[in-house]
């Protein structure tokens, strides 16, 4: 898992790269970024992915989208974002995502997920795995596994997981979900989302070059193909759509639910898996997830990639996947990290994007508005990192600023940012990119058929609290994980 220092002891583990015995042998790698386990990184290995046509991950714009991020005052920018047009070599398909890292190496985790999750999603979609009968199959494997566990604590935790998942799932646009009208595309993409998220999290644990034990990231992602929209969400980043109501008034529609520990179903799952959920006295509005016998790490979300110190205690990486068929009244979608939602309401965000001088500047206008709101509302708090993706659903507007030459337009100094960004990442870059038909992530972790069925069943039954728009943090400085990290036990 790499070398980790506890809050109580600053001395490194014997045999770690920080110990005196390694001071000579490791001298050549002394400039390696903390948290990275692979020092043989070559920037050229990232170039194929960075140069894929239609893929934009730095501040810029195209005819249909714009993205922008700004570093806060809490350290490295842990937010990442991507827009990928012609996704999977499909001319009518676009992938968008924002990722909010947290923990000591959250910026590395967010960038790794940004780069690898779309490839896995495209690969599973490309494989066209048959899903008829699988999504509706109810197996007894999970229950049987629970009854066969000898350890009472483990059996109770597993039984709690099953019980929590038996409740029906309700996503932000549940009224749109009628299985009789959902196209086959949704069923295929839903399984692809579930597989990709599962394998991505496993890869972070077993084959990642970044220490994810106490670090992780959120992910709110979408695939738009024609008039069909599929959204997959983990964590407390959010997707909101600007659409016209019956009176032609622009209104905000929240497409995702902030998956935080304050949701009853999420809290129940965590507690029954022996995790603890409570808020600190200084910030009673923010429920956090804690280890059973240790006041750490204090994670402010119920689902996330990474954070493996909590994965045995109720934290999961299963996405909430929802479907929506777009209409001519739907104008744009905004994906943003909690640095935006902590200080701006859904209505504020939709109004800012709609009133932006041009489509190319909408994301930047939104981020800058959020930064001003932070300074105005919480002058004594540090501004959080902010990242936003604005996807326009009707590209025929003559005000749409960009041409092909403006795709992934870099501002002054961003060429250096690109190099620094990739150097901060791990060494496992793709070896080449043609059609995204394989998962390019080093050693692949496959899911067998029974595991896939179980995964889909669990995702179908995960419950979110209906009928409520869950706002983000109100009035305190945002920290997703506290600084007291659990001690690394040698040999585990």
From Swiss-Prot:
SUPFAM superfamilies: PP2C-like. Residues 1-46, 406-468 are annotated as: Disordered. The lineage of its organism: Eukaryota, Viridiplantae, Streptophyta, Embryophyta, Tracheophyta. Residues 64-393 form the PPM-type phosphatase domain. It catalyses: O-phospho-L-seryl-[protein] + H2O = L-seryl-[protein] + phosphate; O-phospho-L-threonyl-[protein] + H2O = L-threonyl-[protein] + phosphate. Residues 24-35 have a biased composition (Basic residues). Keywords: Hydrolase, Magnesium, Manganese, Metal-binding, Protein phosphatase. This is Probable protein phosphatase 2C 33. CDD domains: PP2Cc. Its EC number is 3.1.3.16. It comes from Arabidopsis thaliana (Mouse-ear cress). Its cofactor is Mg(2+); Mn(2+). Residues 441-460 have a biased composition (Basic and acidic residues). It is an enzyme of class 3 (hydrolase). SMART domains: PP2Cc (SM00332). The keyword Magnesium applies. Binds 2 magnesium or manganese ions per subunit.
């Amino acid at each position: 898992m790499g070398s980790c220092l506890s809050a109580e002891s600053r001395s490194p583990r014997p045999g770690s790269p920080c110990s005196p015995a390694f001071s000579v042998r490791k001298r050549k790698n002394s400039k390696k970024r903390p948290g990275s386990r692979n020092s043989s990184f070559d920037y050229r290995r990232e170039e194929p992915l960075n140069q894929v046509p239609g893929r934009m991950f730095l501040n810029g714009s195209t005819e249909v989208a714009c993205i922008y991020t700004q570093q806060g005052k809490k350290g490295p920018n842990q937010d990442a974002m991507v827009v990928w047009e012609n996704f999977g070599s499909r001319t009518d398909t676009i992938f968008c995502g924002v990722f909010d890292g947290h923990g000591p190496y959250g910026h590395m985790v967010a960038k790794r997920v940004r780069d690898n999750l779309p490839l896995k999603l495209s690969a599973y979609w490309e494989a066209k795995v048959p899903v008829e009968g699988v999504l509706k199959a109810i197996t007894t494997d999970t229950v049987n596994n629970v009854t066969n566990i000898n350890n009472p604590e483990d059996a109770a935790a597993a039984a709690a997981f099953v019980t929590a998942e038996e409740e029906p799932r309700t996503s932000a646009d549940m009224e749109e979900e009628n299985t009789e009208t959902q196209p086959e595309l949704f069923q295929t993409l839903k399984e692809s989302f579930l597989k990709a998220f599962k394998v991505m999290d496993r890869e972070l644990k077993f084959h990642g070059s970044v220490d994810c034990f106490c670090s992780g990231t959120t992910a709110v992602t979408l695939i738009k193909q024609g008039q069909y929209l599929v959204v997959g969400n983990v964590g407390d980043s959010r997707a909101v759509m600007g659409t016209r109501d019956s009176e032609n008034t622009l209104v905000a529609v929240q497409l995702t639910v902030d998956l935080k520990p304050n949701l009853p179903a999420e809290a129940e799952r965590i507690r029954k898996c022996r995790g603890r959920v409570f808020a600190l006295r200084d910030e009673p509005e923010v429920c956090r997830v804690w280890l059973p016998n240790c006041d750490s790490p204090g994670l402010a979300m119920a689902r996330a990639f990474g954070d493996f110190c909590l994965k045995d205690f109720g934290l999961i990486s299963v996405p909430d996947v929802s479907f929506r068929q777009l209409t001519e009244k739907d104008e744009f979608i905004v994906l943003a990290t909690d640095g935006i939602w902590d200080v701006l309401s859904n209505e504020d965000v939709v109004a800012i994007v709609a009133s932006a001088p041009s489509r190319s500047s909408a994301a930047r206008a939104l981020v800058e508005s959020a930064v001003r709101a932070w300074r105005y509302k919480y002058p004594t708090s540090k501004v959080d990192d902010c990242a936003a993706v604005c996807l326009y659903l009707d590209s025929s507007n003559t005000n749409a600023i960009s041409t092909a030459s403006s795709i992934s337009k870099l501002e002054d100094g961003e060429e250096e940012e690109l190099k620094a960004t990739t150097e901060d990442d791990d060494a496992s870059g793709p070896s080449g990119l043609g059609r995204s038909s394989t998962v390019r992530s080093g050693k692949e972790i496959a899911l067998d058929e029974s595991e896939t069925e179980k995964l889909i069943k669990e995702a179908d039954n995960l419950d979110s609290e209906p009928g409520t728009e869950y706002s983000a943090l109100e009035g305190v400085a945002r920290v997703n994980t506290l600084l007291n990290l659990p001690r690394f036990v040698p040999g585990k």
